[in-house]
């Protein structure tokens, strides 16, 4: 849609509060609009009119525009009413895009969006010192869209993209696609098309960066005029990841990634995508190379939660689907001495990849939360007595506390934790592969709880 030159005096409905909705409200107030908030929960204090979101749409004041928060389902009655009345519905990202005057890099994909968003911003900090990162990462676009900055790096979820008009970004990155959010999108094709809205396909000045697999899909079925670049492990990729030499090769530079901090092929592929995006927007290769070893990643993403006497704990609470968990574990060593902690609210996913991974010989699995109802029998059929089922994370650590501690022969003071006669563990990986909402507000709260339990557990181990 075409936004009016000024929002002053316009009555605008913000459907859904939360981080993006509240940011949109604040922006509209600053622009002297007359916003109205419609949400499930009434805020304790608000300076704008409030209506519950289950109000009959006909009872709402007449408005010129609806701004939809990403968590609101497309089937919401107010949205149907708006469509009937031909009232435009836009996203918070749409609103910010209209008012932002700088360049934009957008990042989407099933997994790795947040890390890649922060990584691109990190690589470009010398070339664009005033840049800002945000979007689905937690900093709403409308909180800084009118600032005079040269570059915004935005994480964009499928929900945000589904709700948005064409965003006309300068560079778009589509990292990967795996089964997720099908309770919302219903089919993988719908999910793919929502993600693909990040691309300005008909604009020859736009650059779209994709994985090799997504490039193949686009070449086979989609018409485009934009610049299409790929990253991956084949030599004809525009950013070729050479795992043997630990180099990433583009047409402009050969990058040494031997000192890149984040482990795993999936993180190195995200780095390849990030390098392409940084080059395309005008980043200097020498500056990008200098900054590669300095990036330390984000919390709750295969983060070292604690180490002591050879025992290690990994916090990967951001793993909310099987694709993410399996990517992280793909290059994990000493699988037979690893305890994998799974659980939460499972998504609509094929469990065969999980079973194939477990067949490799996992040390043990602890399964907690709602996932027990649908995952227990299949996992038990593969690993038998190596499966522990518990209610929650507190119970998980009670299992660990009951284990016996034994020294590892010939390795100084290193120890191993024996949970049974046949199960000895040196690494505990919390990569739930499920949503957190059965027991937590979000993956951050879940990850922080895990970190506190790790600290308590390690404090009880004598040095």
Swiss-Prot record:
Its EC number is 6.3.2.9. ATP binds at residues 109-115. The lineage of its organism: Bacteria, Pseudomonadati, Spirochaetota, Spirochaetia, Leptospirales. This is UDP-N-acetylmuramoylalanine--D-glutamate ligase. It comes from Leptospira interrogans serogroup Icterohaemorrhagiae serovar Lai (strain 56601). One of its GO terms (molecular function) is ATP binding. One of its GO terms (biological process) is cell wall organization. HAMAP family: MurD (MF_00639). The gene is murD. The keyword Ribosomal protein does not apply.
